[in-house]
Each structure stands twice: as C-alpha cells, then as structure tokens.
Amino acid sequence: MKFSRLISNALIALTSVCALTVDIDDPDSIAQNAALIAQGLMNYYDGHRYGGVVGMFVFPYYWWEAGAAWNSMLDFWYYTGNDTYNDVVKEALLYQVGKNNDYLPVNQSTTEGNDDQGFWGITAMAAAEKNFSNPGKDEPQWLYLAQAVFNTMSARWDTDHCNGGLRWQIYTWNNGYDYKNTVSNGCLFHLAARLYRYTGNDTYLHWAEKAWDWCEQSGLLNKEDNYHIRDGVDVNNCSNITPYVWTYNAGLFIGGSAFLYNATSDDTWATRAKNIWTGCEELFFQDDKMVEISCQQSRITCNNDQRCFKAIFSRFIGYAALFLPDIRDDIMKKLRASAIAALQTCSGGSDGHTCSIDWLTGAYSNDWIGLGEQMSALEVLQNNLIFNPKMAPNVTTNENGTTGGGIGPLTHDTGGTSEGSPDAGSSSANPLLMNLDIKGSDKAGAGVLTAVLLIGVLGSGWWMLA
C-alpha cells in the first residue's frame, strides 16, 4: 500500500473518532443525530439576525435554495416528530409568497427562474401533504400556493422554441433566458404529479405527461442510455444538448413518476421510475455511497447550489422507495450506506458536528461546509425513517406500495386538510409586463449573477466533455 494511501486512511480514522455515529436501525438514534444536523442547518438562517430577511439564509445562498431548505426542515419535523422549528418554517414559507401569493416576490426578480419558483411550490405541496399547520383564514393555504406556482409556471410554456418546454429564466433581462433547462421542466412535472395525486384533477395529469413527453422528445430524458438525464438545451439550437447530469434532476423525475404510479396504478410510471433508478445506480453511487458525479471527481468543483443537490435527490428517492416496492430494498440499502457515510463527515465546525461534502472518504474539510452540506446530510439520514411507524405514523404498506386512507403523503381524500383553488395564481400579473423599477445597473447585476451560476454549472461539469 502506498504511503499516501496510509496517510489518507489514518486521517479518515481520526475523523471518524469525532464524527457523529448513528445506529441506522434505531429510529431514536437517527432522530437524535438529525436534530444536531438540523441545528447546524439553521445556523445559516438569516431571518433571526439583525437586518436579516425572514425566509432567507445568509449570503451566498440564493432564494431558490432557501425554498429547498425549508422542505428539508419540514421533512425533519415529519420524520422525527421534532417541532422545534415549525414556527420558523411556517413564517418563512408565508413571508416569501409575494404580493400575488404565487412565490414571485418582486425583490427576487433579478435572480428568480422557473426552477426557483418551482422548488418553493414543491415545498408548499409537501406542507399540504403532511398536514403541516395550516395558515390563518386570511392567509394563502399550502395547496393554494402550490396550485398558484403550477398555474403561473404552466402559463409560461413556450411552443415557439424547441416545440415546447419552460425556459430557465422567467424574466427576459436575466442571462439564461435562452436556455431551457431540465430542472425547470422537472419541477413542473413533479409538482403536476403531486397535485394530481392530491386533488384528482386530470389537468395536472395532462401537464405531467406533457412535461415528460417534451423532455423525452427533446433528448433530455434519453431512454437509450438508462435515462441519464441531461441538463438542458439552447433555444437557438434545440439539438444542442448540455450533457451534464445532476442528482436533483433525476430525483425530480423518479419522485414524480412514483407519485403518478401511486395515483394511477399505471405501470408506465413504475417502469419509467425503475429505468431512471437504473441510471442513478450507474451514475450517482460508488460502493452504495451517494456522489454528485458531475462535480465530485478526483477534484471537487461543486458550487454552492450543487452542494445541496444530494439533499433533493435523497428526498425524492425516498418517495420512490415508499411507492415502488420493486426497487424499495435497493434504494433503502443505498440510503442507509449514504447516511452512515455522510455522518462520518459531520465532525467539524465550532459545534463539532458540522457536515462536509465528501461521503466517499468520510473526510471533513473546512473548504466544503455550508447550507448544502447540512441539507444533504439531514435528508439522506431522515429518509431512513420513511417506513418507521413511530416517526412517520401515517405510512402503511401493501403489495402496491402505499395506498388507501390515513397514509402519508396525504391526499384530499385521505385526510389532507389544506384547501386550494384550481384558478390560484391565474389572475396574477404577467411577470414580463410588471411595472418593475429595474434600473440598467440592476439588469447588469442580474446578468452577472445568472452568468456566474451558468458558468458554475458548465465549469463544474468539465469532465463530461473530456
């Protein structure tokens, strides 16, 4: 064995002495460790700080990631029963709705894209399905918010370029407006799938099928290579596919397909989910440990956004395990191994259990800590509770996955109490016609921000083109 390998192993051994340790078969152990990681996640929250913004996390974390982080905290309560942060979560989700209750706050117009809005809508959907504390009568309800996001997103479907699909950006002045990315369309697909399951409204099923079909026809979902889901296409050259693969894109589609299978019993959706999972196994796991392969090679290059993708992926493959018995054991095996590996990195920071990015080695690094690392460790750990009756009492199983009354995630017919409206958001102003006070310098700043994000996506995936 090479000397460098011996040194590496020694460092890993030293790290593991101080790392969080979990009995993955003990729900109480999982819950106790999840509480420590959740506390670390909330250390990045900006809303309690002097001059901070309710619902937002400290710089450099963008608005979209805040929406995804609140979903992680919602899951934390649901799976562990720990309601410590529930009031904060509720306040955050309602503070950021925007004046039209559609998660289009004007102060985010220089950065907000379709995917950003989509993740807040998905979090609102999760709140409805989990019977999270309902807002007051004079406030928008969780289902209403999810429907408003869906309606405003679907209204932007663009048939003039590439025969359909959503653009990445909502606003014309943001760089990336000429790019149709998979995550925006994946959010629309995923949200439509869950709205259909919750409400039974066929409009949502139609849109889920429409979004899937477009992604498949455009080459972003390619069944010829086990659905290695690609990043997006340029509207000026629709055959120019950006090849990078990300866990969260796969998660959106496997999770949405699982919800649709549960709602329809249509084997088409089960087959699609299984095929995506086969691709995920090929790309995103090494020795059963999860890896963000497009930016975790011999050198880690993940940007701030990409460092939380494993959180979103863990959440959605958890749903796939819940609804798809054929791949359940395989998914849970990888969630178990990944959770144990993730906690090996949770050994640093002033609290002694700050988590890091490299689950393959278990090594902690001060260079790779932040909101995304905490989210990812939290989600991969707490999704090991998805079948635990003590921590998730609404879950029951049968040969077809989870069906019937009293089952989580809930529907309107199985105990979900959140109310909405099929027309939610439809009366909102067209964001492209809004009388916004956008100065030239703001447009330039927005362009720089979005360009930086795009460069990060392209730069971190250098290996795909090598």
Could you say what each language-model-derived stretch is?
Residues 3-19:
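Cleavable N-terminal signal peptides of Sec/SRP-targeted secreted and luminal proteins
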Residues 20-115, 119-121, 127-128, 180, ...:
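CBM-like carbohydrate-recognition segments
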Residues 38, 73, 93, 124, ...:
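Inward-facing hydrophobic residues that define packing positions of alpha-helical scaffold repeats
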Residues 77, 128-135, 196-200, 261-265, ...:
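Short coil/turn linking the two alpha-helices of tandem helical-hairpin repeats
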Residues 90-91, 95-192:
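Extended ligand-binding groove/face enriched in aromatic
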Residues 33, 84, 88, 138-141, ...:
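Alpha-helical positions within canonical tetratricopeptide repeat
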Residues 139, 173-175, 204, 221-244, ...:
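Juxtamembrane/interface segments of multi-pass membrane proteins
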Residues 183-199, 203-260, 273, 277-280:
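Active-site cradle of extracellular carbohydrate-active enzymes
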